[in-house]
Amino acid sequence: VEIYLPAHYDAEREEPYKVLYLSHGGGGEEGDWFHQGNAANIVDRLVTEGKCEEFIIVCMNNAEYIIEGMRDWDFDAIFENTKDYLIPYIEQNYNVSTEVADRAYAGLSNGAKTTTMIYYKDPELFGYYGMFSGSAAWAWPELEDYSAMKEPNIYLAAGFADHLMM
């Protein structure tokens, strides 16, 4: 796990921080959003310019959960780890809000696929979901029942020539 704390992080601040859980894509690791994506620099600049408030980013290594004999991630294990261990750990060790409305999950490529599965399994675990250049999650039979997907706060994005979205 790699964690971004705002420049002026205050463990005793009265108002707890919001949290963005951010998943890398296939072949990546927890540091990709910071080392390749410059997430910390981007957020620092947005905060400095008054375009967003300070928040915490938590990046996990989802590539550790690969189904044996397959190239795909074990999305059930990632979901359980996030829900049962990662969120409670962050909430116990950092000054963060425990309100669902103050928690978001987003991911790139295979991370977007992860985001889709987490949303499907427990749409109320996070207040917001972001899927960036995600692959064909609709190919999963379990996603044919959309009844759990009510009033979503979802942001979808893909590049103009992103073949995964065509």
Map each language-model feature to its residues.
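Non-catalytic cap/lid and distal C-terminal segments of serine-dependent acyl enzymes
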Residues: 1-166
